[in-house]
From Swiss-Prot:
GO terms for biological process: G protein-coupled receptor signaling pathway. This is Partner of bursicon. It comes from Apis mellifera (Honeybee). The keyword Signal applies. The gene is pburs. Final heterodimeric neurohormone released at the end of the molting cycle, involved in the sclerotization (tanning) of the insect cuticle, melanization and wing spreading. Residues 1-28 form the signal peptide.
Amino acid sequence: MKENFSIMFIHSIFLILIIFIYSNETIAQVTDDENCETLQSEVHITKDEYDEIGRLKRTCSGDISVTKCEGFCNSQVQPSVASTTGFSKECYCCRESYLKERHITLHHCYDADGIKLMNEENGVMEIKIREPVECKCIKCGDISQ
């Protein structure tokens, strides 16, 4: 009777251990998904231009489509005897891994009095922007990339 109880007890512990391991693997699979991607976004840009003595010469604006990084990355905090805080942190952020320069033309230009500029020379403004070409999960605070 005592041996049967011991065998049943061992089988029960073994079954609980298997369920625990399976549950942890399932949780790891669910939280292991990263979703960091490059998406299109519409933004409104306004740029002021000043003369040599600092007076407003013209203001130009426009709505343009640009790329942006959006999504989430895996991060974790776990107990650590090596760390002074008692925890080891690994944080990752969805950021640009490569930027490209792009020339944009703003078509709505106004002088300092708010009058729309129509001539070819002042009616448009060329500006340069930098936008992400590729996004990925990068260690948070790492500005080298």
